[in-house]
């Protein structure tokens, strides 16, 4: 209690013995629930909701801690297609394969090739993912949201990073983020289509988008050579 021994807060009633008795009863009456609770405790599962606009602040207490992280509301990653992804923890090659499957490709933004009004976004293969850095990921098969479980990762809840190349920015998101409606934001959609965002919108966390200056001549963006 506050104030030390012998200085209990006025009006405070100690229910600790009653609570202990209830816990003991429930443990004996429902042993399977007790086992499940202990399993969850040992896993230290953190359900990271990418729809939250304050995800970084909400999970600040877990910053620097090792947890099993489930991405909630991230939606599936599509097999055979590029998916923009940004995570609040590092992944080595083994961890990438464990979640996204054998044959998965991961690439980092490296440059732009301009051909008049058509801009080609170029990427370089990588074997590890760093926290807060945006990447594109192509699994062989669909990866369901329920499979986005990352075991024993160390959370680093700094702001997502911006990778700038040749006047273009690849911007990661770790929480729900507003996108400008001025035509400078481009989002990677299904079938590797990069679409210009012309209306105000919000992009969920653990994704990424591109910013092309309004002064550029870009009328279309595409993912460059995959080799």
Model segments located where?
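Middle-to-C-terminal accessory/interaction subdomains
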Residues: 1-43
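A short linear-motif detector with a strong N-terminal bias
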Residues: 4-5, 11-13, 64, 114-116, ...
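A short, polar beta-strand/turn micro-motif
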Residues: 42-100, 122-193, 198-226
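Phosphate-backbone binding interfaces of nucleic-acid-interacting proteins
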Residues: 105
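C-terminal outer-membrane/trafficking sorting elements
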Residues: 110-113, 227
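Conserved SET/PR domain catalytic loop and adjacent active-site segment
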Residues: 112-115, 132
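Short linear interaction motifs
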Residues: 115-123
């Amino acid at each position: 209690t506050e104030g030390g021994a012998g200085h209990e807060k006025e009006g405070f009633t100690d229910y600790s013995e009653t609570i202990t008795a209830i816990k003991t009863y429930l443990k004996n009456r429902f042993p399977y629930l007790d086992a499940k609770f202990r399993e969850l405790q040992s896993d230290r599962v953190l359900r990271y909701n990418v729809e939250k606009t304050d995800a970084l602040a909400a999970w600040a207490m877990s910053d620097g801690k090792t947890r099993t992280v489930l991405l909630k509301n991230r939606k599936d990653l599509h097999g055979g297609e590029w998916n923009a992804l940004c995570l609040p923890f590092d992944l080595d090659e083994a961890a990438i394969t464990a979640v996204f499957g054998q044959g998965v490709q991961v690439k980092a933004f490296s440059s732009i090739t301009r051909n008049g009004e058509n801009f080609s976004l170029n990427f370089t293969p990588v074997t590890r993912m760093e926290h807060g850095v945006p990447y594109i990921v192509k699994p062989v098969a669909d990866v369901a949201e329920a499979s986005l479980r990352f075991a024993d990762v160390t959370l680093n809840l700094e702001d997502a990073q911006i990778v700038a190349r040749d006047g273009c920015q690849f911007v990661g998101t770790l929480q729900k983020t507003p996108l400008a409606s001025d035509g400078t934001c481009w989002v990677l959609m299904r079938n590797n289509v990069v679409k210009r965002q012309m209306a105000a919108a919000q992009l969920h966390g653990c994704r990424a988008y591109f910013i092309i200056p309004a002064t550029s001549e870009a009328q279309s963006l595409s993912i460059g050579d995959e080799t």
